[in-house]
Amino acid sequence: MDTRFHCVYLLTSLDPQCEGAHYIGYTVNPIRRLRQHNGELVNGARRTKRNGRPWLLLMCVSGFGEDRIALKFEWCWQNPSKSTRLKSHVSQLRCVHKLTHAVGVLLLLLRTELFSRLQLTLHIFDREHFDKVISQLLSALPTMEPLVETSLLRVESTTIEQFQTQYMNDGQWGAAVDYGAYFMRAPPGANVDVSKPIVGGQDNTLRCGVMHNNLCEEEVIRQHVKERTLLESGHYPCSLCSLPLRAPYFLRCSRTPFCRLRAHIVCLAMWFIYDSSQRGGDPLVKDAGPAEVAENSNDAACQVNENCYSLSGCGPVVGGIFNHDAYTDRRDDNSPPSPPCPLPTQSSQADASLAATSLPLVPRAPCDCPLCDEELQWSALVYDLKRRVAVEKRRAERERREAMDAEFAQRFQRLQSESNKKSTARERGALEGVRRKRRRRGEVAAKLTQQTAVRHEPTSGASGDRAHSAPPAPSCGGFDEIPANVTNPTAPLHADVLQVTEFNVDEWLNH
């Protein structure tokens, strides 16, 4: 849950040489950002530093629940020709330029389907300058529809001091309201005059405030992290029943973060119905006295309490909105427990039909916030809830994909390391085989060399001269030359052997 103040602002230059120059940006504190653009503080924009000073804060748009929506609004405002929501309508603004063109883009952007469903607020700081620009725009474009307030869009004229006091400073009640301590009206059925001012205040306007100006960014971030931790752990209480909320299935005020209203859907729906009944819009309380109003409101709350419990199965809700005693009395008569939604019993269906005929469960009329008296639109609250649920689902799906990708990468790395080990073992085995073959070939060559050397040695019975004489050198191309590839070579014949075995013809004839 983001508790920061997100807004998109429009600056215009007061320099006569830069008439019509403007700047569009996003910030969480437009007053401080204006001082940065004018050079009073550091970290200003480069574009506003070169020329155009001093700059005037003409307007800003607030009401964005998250920074992503505000940044998307800023980008569409800065790039209307590239935005899919404006590029088909921005052609009608060709005849206007500079500041008038920027204001015209804003009027078109506030009417788009995406941003028209949000409960936004347009803060105008210089009404005279704004009306002058609007008159120039409408005179140049007669077909352009003027800016009007709707049930979701609120336009207010303010000054920097009022804006600082109302949005940036602490509320009139001092520090931020702690969890569980709320300034609320009386619960349904209580005989209390709600027109009287609440205890601790002098009027019925703002009932709680949050600290922004007196806290640095680190403190705001720390508070945001604390609330998000409480939501994720299931310890953030509902503003109406004090039971824990389950993120993101809860409704919040459109003045977030200046209002800390966080409520269950059923609880806030009950508050809408109660507020409409107090205004006289419900037939149960029309033309009735104070006692009858209290009794009828209490009976209606009991009926919707039983119906909501039987349909949701979430248990009784305490804190003054639902009648816990009536529920306890109904549970003491040994009746079987009501099954959870979507399988209601016949009795719960009958109670639901009875409650539907007497009191609508889906609010239709706007209602004031029980904490800050801001006008709430049920459709805008439900749209914000659906958007947050969709964002949460996408975030969970993205985290799931990232976890799966990390697991697959880890498995692939493990398999790759195992295959590398096997390939290394195979390479080592092949290298060892090659070395073994080379070793065997060397041994065979050494044996052949030894045999050749032994056969070339002279016999022991030969004369000393022959024994000490050097062996004859082998003749090139003769029979004494031994080829290198002969495995069993024959020793050369000596002269003594030839003399003994030589055939003499004369001796043979004499015999």
Swiss-Prot record:
GO terms classed as biological process: DNA recombination; DNA repair
GIY-YIG domain mapped to chain residues: 4-87
Domain of life: Eukaryota
Biased composition (Basic and acidic residues): 419-434
Region named Disordered: 325-349, 417-484
Enzyme nomenclature, EC number: 3.1.-.-
Stretches annotated zinc finger (SLX1-type): 238-372
UniProt KW Zinc-finger keyword: yes
PANTHER family linked to this entry: STRUCTURE-SPECIFIC ENDONUCLEASE SUBUNIT SLX1
Subunit structure: Forms a heterodimer with a member of the SLX4 family.
UniProt protein name: Structure-specific endonuclease subunit SLX1 homolog
